[in-house]
């Protein structure tokens, strides 16, 4: 019998963006259900939102965006979708209620109400550093925004 040898640590696998998105959707499903929320997934991928999140008294249209690449000490999230013939368009309250950004390498979640991000099309999140203007940090792990008695509360 051969003695065991220690293997070199595995390098992280860089998946394509579609696979990363699928894994983030699975992680969101697990996280939300663990916190007591219920989720439904629309049939197909033609809607502007990825999930319907049920808090009891309210249904939220949730668009999930994930990012895994660190650029200039931050993570970029594009709050846009494509329309044939019109190009890239920013989300509005007619499209979604909540944009959820998943920072994959550190498993951090930002729950951003659409009113907070409109009309921005690009967000830069800095979960690892303190910034002078922490514009989005108040939405980091802000699961409390989904609680029934908190829906109208401003952050």
Feature-to-residue mapping (PLM):
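Mixed-charge (Asp/Glu-Lys/Arg
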Residues: 1-47, 52-155
């Amino acid at each position: 019998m051969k003695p065991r040898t220690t293997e070199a640590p595995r390098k992280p696998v860089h998946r394509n963006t579609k696979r990363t998105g699928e894994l983030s959707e699975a992680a969101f499903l697990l996280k939300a259900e663990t916190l007591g929320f219920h989720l439904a997934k629309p049939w197909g991928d033609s809607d502007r939102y990825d999930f319907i999140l049920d808090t009891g008294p309210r249904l939220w249209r949730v668009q999930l965006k994930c990012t895994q690449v660190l650029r200039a000490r931050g993570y970029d999230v594009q709050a846009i979708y494509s329309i044939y013939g019109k190009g890239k368009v920013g989300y509005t309250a007619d499209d979604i209620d909540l944009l959820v950004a998943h920072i994959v390498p550190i498993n951090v979640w930002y729950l951003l109400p659409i009113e907070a991000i409109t009309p921005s099309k690009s967000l830069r999140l800095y979960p690892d550093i303190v910034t002078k203007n922490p514009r989005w940090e108040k939405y980091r792990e802000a699961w409390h925004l989904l609680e029934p008695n908190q829906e109208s509360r401003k952050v």
